[in-house]
From Swiss-Prot:
Protein name: Imidazolonepropionase
UniProt binding sites for Fe(3+): 69, 71, 239, 314
Localization per record: Cytoplasm
Lineage, highest ranks first: Bacteria, Pseudomonadati, Pseudomonadota, Gammaproteobacteria, Legionellales
One cellular component (GO) term of this entry: cytoplasm
Membrane spanning stretches: none
PANTHER family: IMIDAZOLONEPROPIONASE (PTHR42752), IMIDAZOLONEPROPIONASE-RELATED (PTHR42752:SF1)
UniProt cofactor note: Binds 1 zinc or iron ion per subunit.
Length: 403
C-alpha cells in the first residue's frame, strides 16, 4: 500500500499571497494535496512509500492558473470594426451602422451549438496550453432565452471536451435584446421571470452577472436582477464602474458579490464596501489596452483598503480578443503597477475567490484539489517578465499530469 500517489520534491512554490517559497515538497493522494511544506519537514512515511516521485530541480510550481472573467463562447469576429477604428471611425458610429455587441449577438444566434463549439474550443485550449486549469465563461451574446441557454450548454460541453474546469456565468444583462429595443425594463422583467429561472432549472448557471453602466443597465435594474439571483440562491458578479461611477460596486457588495470587474472609476466608498463584503476586484488589462483607456483602476486604493485583486483575460471579440493570461499578467505589472506577488496571487488565489472556489483550488494547501503547474523556470518573476512567449511547463489536473 502506497502512502501517496505522487511526491514532488525539490520544488519552489508560491503561497496564497504570491510570495515564492523554496525547498518545498508536495504530496498528492487521490487527486488532492495530502501534505505540502518545507522538504526537511516531510513526514518519513511519504518519503518511504510514494507510488511515484519527481525531482523538480528547484523549478517553480504554482497552482493551476485561473481565468476568472471570459466571454469566450461566441461566433464570428469583429476584425472589420477594428479596421474602421484604426481609420478613426468612432465606436458610436460603428454601433449605429449595426456593429458592436449586437453584431456578435446576431452571429452567435445564427450559429448552431456545433459551430459555437468549433469556434470556441480553440480559445479554451489556448488558455489550457498556458497552464490555465479553471475558466469562467459568461453568456451574453444570445440575449434571448433560446440563445442564452445555447451558450451556457456550449460552455459546459467545452469544459468536458478540453479537460478544463469551467464555471458558467449568466450574463443576459450584457445588453438589451434587440427585440426589446427602446424598452429595457421589459427586457429586464423577461430576464428575471423567464430566462434566469430556466437556466437555473437546467443546472446551466453557477453565477449571475450584470453590466451596470449608463450604456447598459441602471442601478435599479441591476438590483432587480441581483434580487432575482438571490431568490434562486445564485451568487452574483458585476461589471462595475468601467466607464463611470454609478455606485454599482456598492450595490453589488450589498448583495455579497463574489467580484466586481473592470473598476476603472471605482471610488473609496465603493472599495470600502467591497472590503466589508469580501468582494474581489477583477482587473482586466486586456480591455484597458485594446480600448486605449486612459483611466486606470485604482490599484493603490484597492491595496490600501485591502480589496483582493484578481486578473483575467476578459476574452471577448469586442474589447479584449486575447486568450493569453500570461500576457495579462505582464500587462498588469506594466500598466497597473502591480507587484509580482500580487499578480501571481491574482491569477491563483484571488481568482479562485472571485469564483467562490477558494476552498478547493487557487493555492497549494493540504486538502485542496491538486491542480498544479510545474514551470521550466526557477524565478517566479519570469512568469510576468516574459510576454507573448510560451513558457514550457507541465500541468496537473486533479492529481493527473495532462501535458
Amino acid at each position: 500500500m502506497f502512502a501517496c500517489d505522487e511526491l514532488l520534491l525539490n520544488a519552489s512554490t508560491i503561497d496564497a499571497t504570491g510570495l515564492q517559497l523554496y525547498n518545498q515538497a508536495i504530496v498528492i493522494r487521490k487527486g488532492r494535496i495530502e501534505w505540502c511544506g518545507s522538504e526537511d519537514q516531510l513526514p518519513v512515511h511519504f518519503q518511504e512509500s510514494a507510488k511515484s516521485r519527481k525531482d523538480c530541480h528547484g523549478q517553480l510550481i504554482t497552482p493551476g492558473l485561473i481565468d476568472c472573467h471570459t466571454h469566450l463562447v461566441y461566433a464570428g469576429h469583429r476584425a472589420a470594426e477594428f479596421r474602421l477604428k484604426s481609420q478613426g471611425v468612432s465606436y458610436a458610429d460603428i454601433a449605429k451602422s449595426g456593429g458592436g455587441i449586437l453584431s456578435t449577438v446576431q452571429m452567435t444566434r445564427d450559429a448552431s451549438e456545433e459551430e459555437l463549439i468549433d469556434q470556441s474550443l480553440p480559445r479554451l485550449l489556448a488558455l489550457k496550453n498556458e497552464g490555465v486549469t479553471t475558466v469562467e465563461i459568461k453568456s451574453g451574446y444570445g440575449l434571448d432565452l433560446q440563445n442564452e441557454l445555447k451558450m451556457l450548454r456550449v460552455a459546459r460541453q467545452l469544459g468536458d471536451m478540453a479537460g478544463v474546469r469551467v464555471k458558467t456565468t449568466f450574463l443576459g444583462a450584457h445588453a438589451v435584446g434587440p427585440e426589446f429595443k427602446g424598452n429595457s425594463q421589459a427586457y429586464v422583467d423577461f430576464l428575471c421571470n423567464e430566462m434566469l429561472p430556466a437556466a437555473k432549472n437546467m443546472d446551466l448557471v453557477d453565477a449571475v452577472d450584470v453590466f451596470c453602466e449608463s450604456i447598459a443597465f441602471s442601478i435599479r435594474q441591476a438590483e432587480q436582477i441581483f434580487q432575482a439571483a438571490k431568490n434562486l440562491n445564485l451568487p452574483i458578479k458585476c461589471h462595475a464602474e468601467q466607464l463611470s461611477n454609478m455606485g454599482a460596486s456598492s450595490l453589488a457588495a450589498r448583495y455579497g458579490a463574489l467580484s466586481c470587474d473592470h473598476l476603472e472609476f471605482l471610488d473609496e466608498n465603493g472599495a470600502l464596501n467591497m472590503v466589508k463584503a469580501n468582494t474581489v476586484a477583477v482587473l482586466l488589462p486586456g480591455a484597458f489596452y485594446f480600448l486605449k483607456e486612459k483611466q486606470k483602476p485604482p490599484v493603490d486604493l484597492l491595496r490600501q483598503v485591502g480589496v483582493g485583486m484578481a486578473i483575467a483575460t476578459d476574452s471577448n471579440p469586442g474589447s479584449s480578443p486575447t486568450t493569453s493570461l500570461l500576457l495579462m499578467m505582464s500587462m498588469a505589472c506594466q500598466f497597473f503597477s502591480m507587484s509580482i506577488p500580487e499578480v501571481l496571487s491574482a491569477v491563483t488565489y484571488q481568482a479562485s475567490r472571485a469564483l467562490g472556489m477558494e476552498k478547493d483550488i487557487g493555492s497549494i494547501e493540504a486538502g485542496k484539489i491538486a491542480d498544479l503547474v510545474l514551470w521550466s523556470i526557477k524565478d517566479s518573476a519570469a512568469l510576468c517578465y516574459y510576454f507573448a512567449y510560451p513558457l514550457p511547463h507541465q500541468t496537473m489536473v486533479a492529481g493527473e499530469w495532462v501535458s
